[in-house]
């Protein structure tokens, strides 16, 4: 299986009243089956990059691990599309439902008892970070220009973690949840504290994305799109500042505006 994030493929295009042969970039979908302690845990449809980060972040998001020390080993066999994970503990009965799930690239899991299962992992933010409007606009501009593949295909989600000035990590994936899990895995691997960091995201802030941000532990999430009503409710409850519709030099603050300060003051 080809491991490129995107591939040039021949197509027929219609333009200016004519049909002609050309090439176009397609994003790659890669099925990765995650085995935990020898048992099939889930299959994730993803972009074939930063797979170890993805696996670690996904397991942390699911509550299977809470810290790096719980991982004994992670072996990625990308030639066969498997990730073999050994933990220093048993998963326990509550993860029996998780076996043999297929997590599509286009959407969340839409699983039963979603909020009950995630409530124990999502964190109420204690972040003290503050941002100026210029910082917010600059971070979104940088995110949008960071990926040439997104500019070529329009088919990848981009996400980054920043302190307001510097991007600590930038990741991309065909799945919006995967992009965030890669960030999460990166931070867990390196023991990076994200409480006073910002999550910058190219997609819409849905309730699932907001909960994912809470699991990662950030206090601010920025998006070029608007959030959903449930996402705003959760952001208020979890003390997360949600900023959306960042474009053309403006933006909307949907929750906890106290973290955004006027640069003129």
Swiss-Prot record:
Pfam families according to UniProt: FdhD-NarQ (PF02634)
Active site residues of this protein: 107 (cysteine persulfide intermediate)
Keyword Cytoplasm: yes
Gene Ontology BP, a term: Mo-molybdopterin cofactor biosynthetic process
Gene3D superfamilies in alphabetical order: 3.10.20.10, Cytidine Deaminase, domain 2
InterPro entries named among the record's database cross-references: Cytidine_deaminase-like (IPR016193), FdhD (IPR003786)
Keyword annotations from UniProtKB, A to Z: Cytoplasm, Molybdenum cofactor biosynthesis
Family membership: Belongs to the FdhD family.
Protein name: Sulfur carrier protein FdhD
Organism encoding this protein: Staphylococcus aureus (strain JH9)
């Amino acid at each position: 299986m080809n491991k490129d994030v995107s591939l040039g493929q021949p197509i027929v295009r219609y333009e200016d009243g004519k049909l002609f042969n050309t090439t176009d970039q397609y994003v790659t979908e890669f099925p990765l089956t995650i085995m935990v302690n020898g048992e099939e845990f889930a299959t994730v449809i993803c972009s074939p990059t930063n797979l170890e980060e993805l696996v670690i972040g996904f397991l942390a998001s699911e509550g299977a691990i809470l810290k790096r020390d719980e991982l004994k080993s992670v072996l990625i066999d990308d030639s066969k599309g498997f990730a073999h994970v050994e933990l220093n503990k048993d998963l326990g009965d509550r993860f029996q439902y998780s076996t043999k799930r297929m997590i599509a690239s286009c959407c969340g899991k839409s699983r039963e008892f979603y909020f009950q299962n995630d409530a124990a992992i999502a964190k109420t933010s204690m972040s003290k970070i503050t941002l100026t409007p210029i910082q917010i606009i600059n971070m979104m501009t940088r995110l949008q220009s960071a990926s040439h593949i997104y500019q070529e295909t329009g088919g990848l989600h981009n996400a980054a973690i920043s302190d307001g000035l510097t991007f600590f990590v930038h990741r991309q994936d065909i799945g919006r949840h995967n992009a965030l899990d890669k960030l999460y895995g990166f931070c867990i691997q390196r023991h990076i504290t994200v409480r006073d960091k910002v999550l910058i995201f190219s997609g819409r802030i849905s309730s699932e994305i907001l909960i994912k941000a809470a699991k990662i532990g950030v206090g601010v999430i920025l998006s070029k799109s608007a959030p959903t009503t449930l996402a705003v409710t959760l952001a208020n409850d979890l003390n997360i500042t949600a900023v959306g519709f960042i474009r053309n030099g403006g933006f909307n603050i949907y929750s906890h505006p106290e973290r955004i300060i006027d640069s003129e003051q």
